[in-house]
Structures are given as structure tokens and as C-alpha cells.
UniProtKB/Swiss-Prot annotation:
HAMAP family: Ser_tRNA_synth_type1. ATP binds at R286, K287, E288, V302, E373, M374, V375, S376. This is Serine--tRNA ligase. Pathway: Aminoacyl-tRNA biosynthesis; selenocysteinyl-tRNA(Sec) biosynthesis; L-seryl-tRNA(Sec) from L-serine and tRNA(Sec): step 1/1. Pfam families: Seryl_tRNA_N, tRNA-synt_2b. It comes from the Archaea. The keyword RNA-binding does not apply. GO terms for molecular function: ATP binding; serine-tRNA ligase activity. CDD domains: SerRS_core.
Amino acid sequence: MTWSILRYLRENPDILKDSMRKRGLDPSVIDEAKRVDEEWRKLKRQVDEIRHRHNVITRQIASARDPEERRKLIEEARRLLAEREELEKKLKALEEERERILLSLPNIVHDSVPVGFSDEENVPIRFWGRPRVYRGHLDAFKAQTERWGFKVDYELIDWKPVGHADMLEYVLKLGNTMKAAEVAGSRFYYLFDDIVWLDFALLLYAIDRLTQKGYRLVLPPYMIRHKILMGVIDMETFKDAIYKVEDEDLYLIATAEHPLAGLYYNEEIMEDELPIKLVGISPCFRKEAGAGNRDLKGIFRVHQFHKVEQFVYAKPEESWDILEELIRNAEELFQGLGLPYRVVNVVSGELGAPAAKKYDLEVWMPAQGKYREMVSASNTTDWQSYRLNIRLVRKKDMKREYVHTLNSTAIASTRTITAILENFQEPDGTVVIPKVLRKYLEIFPKAPKDAIHPVKKVRG
């Protein structure tokens, strides 16, 4: 049972170097890891040889008749034991050094990932829907579609939709970020009435659809310990994004992916139990320290939100097909909502450390004239399972190996609400509620039924 990164280090380190280059990282660390590993393996052979000699002498002592011979054998056994113990200390230090280096490495980039270092280089692989395009955004729309060789049908409109932030706070008057900033700081919000109902309806819609597909519904812990967090993310990259509970070994979760990945921590899973498909629902908490001044208005990029997350434990030979399943599940949800989108293959330099490959689903935002990310789906292969010690047991020979883990957004409620506010906005400011959500609202007397009406009409 060998972790893939350690296997490639020994069998084909050039693959690891190439993967590092694709991410824009220095590949020389691979040479250092290989040097330490070779030194460890050489010393391991010495230790094993000494152990063997010690065992042989121990048996000779048991059968020795001559006292002098027995004394000499005992002295030699003691010398070998002392030598072995000293070498084992060096061996342990080398093993720890090798582990430190290898655990700092990102996952191996899959061959199908395009090489690039900016999200503007992400490669669209398909489009869906008929977006409404404001005349003033037509050139920008074509640059995001035709540049990549796609001819996407669209509806040209002469009125510019109001942006989601202004729709929320001034047209519908169902949100208040200024007061939330006084109470909690920037990127927090108060939502009211119909928008809250819409938030809940989106969550119910996602878990309803996914549980019908056989995904097990999970309400996970909203906090996790450091050792689990270290197993699921690159802490060096994300330390400024995660909220820590003061004086406690606990962190607020940034996504349900993290506690779901810990569900089988330090466990073995029989082959015939896989794949294990989960759908988690939780609040998410993110510092967004690296966001700077991006998306300061509204609820697109915030410190807390609700999310439904897909998570799968899979056999290695099935994980790539399951990645396609996860993104298709998300696409079906957004098709049901009627939100026009594109799926992009994320370039190597924009992958997070755990991901070997990632798809983003981006919805067209008519007021912004851009496709914006709503969903990320990743195959982390054995990057997380090695750290969390989660193994599968093959039925035929009881061989152990590390499972593959995969994750994908199903619905992030606040972002999806921003897309609804812009895409289903009428000229007067009315927001039509997607039909698939209405059955989750109609049972509540106070919930909106088919539309959210403006307090302040925009036009007409």
C-alpha cells in the first residue's frame, strides 16, 4: 500500500516535477525529497540487516553450550542492539523529514488539466441555456463564448438589469449589509422575508434531488479539529481563510466537504461498500482575506452562507467517472433553475493543492456581463485519504490502498440567489421565482409563491 506521490517519487519523479511546473511551483523540492528517501531506504536496509543478524545471534545464544562462546554472543547481540537503536533514531528522523516534504506537495495534476496560471485561461468545455445579454455587454459576452469556439444563442435586451446588490437592498429592500457591517463587520448581511424563504427553498431543492439519486443526507459538525483540517486542505494557503476558535483546538468549517472527509478518519472501508455518496448541508464560514476589494457589495462573496455539498469516497479506478457525475449533478440543478451557465476546466495554476483536477460551473450574470463561479467540483484522488488514513480493503486479496475522495458544490445559497436576482429580473424589478422552487414554498402561507415584488419599481 503506497501513497501515489511516494510511488511516483521512487518510480518516476519527473512526473512530480512536471506537475510542480504546471502549478508554477519550484520542482527542486522533488530532488530534495528523492535524496532524503534514498538515504532512508539505504539506512532501512542496514537496520533490517542488523535486525536479522541480531535475531540469528539470539537463536545461537539459546543453543550455545560453551560459556565463553555464549558470553561473546551476548556481547555481540548487545552491540548490534545498540547500533540498531542508534540507526533507528536516524531512520525516524529521515522518515519525518521525507514526510514533511511530501506533505507539503500539492496533488499530481491530471493529464487532462490545461496548463495556465490565471482563471482567465480556464477552458470552457460546454455551455447551457439562453442568456439574456444587455446590448452594452454584447462584446464581452462574445469574448467569453466565441473566443473559445462556441456559438451560444442569446436574448439581446435593451434595458440593463440592476445588479444583485442594489436589487437586494434598494429595489426589493430584503437585505441590509450596512447594518450587518456595524454589527459584525464587512461581508456579513441581514436577509429578510422572501429572500430567506428563497435561501431555504434552494437548499431543500438540492438535497431533495440528490437524495433521490441515492446520496445519503448528512448534517455534519460545524467545527473540526486541527488534525482533520490539516488532512483536507493546504493549511499554509488557507490559514488566512479559516476562522479559529480562540483557545480551542477547533475551527469553523469553510465547507461541509471538510467534516465529510473526516467521517472515515483512521478507518478501513471494504471494497464492496464503495462508492459512498454523501450530500451534506451546513453553514460555511470563510474569512475571504485574499479577496481584497472584490465583490464588496451584496452577498456574492461573504463570510457566512449555507451550502449543500456532494462528497464521495471512491475506488481509484472509478473516481474519474464519479467526477463527471458530480459536475453533471450540479448542472442538472442549475438547468432545473433555468440559469444559463458554462462549465470550465480549471487551469493547473489555479488548482488548490488537494485537487488533481477541478471543474467550475459559472452562471451568466446579466448585470455584470460576466460568467461567475457558482460550483466547484474536484477529484482529490488520495491526497486527503493519505493524510486522514482512510483505506479501502480489496475483497479478493484483502490488499489495502488509499481511497479516492471527491467533492462538489451542489448549491451555495447566497451566490445562487445573486444569480436569480439578475437572471429572473423583470424590467420593473420583479423577480420571478424559478418554477422548480415553488413546491418548496407553497406549503408555507407566508412564503412567496411565484415572484418577489419590488418595493421600489425600477421602470414602468
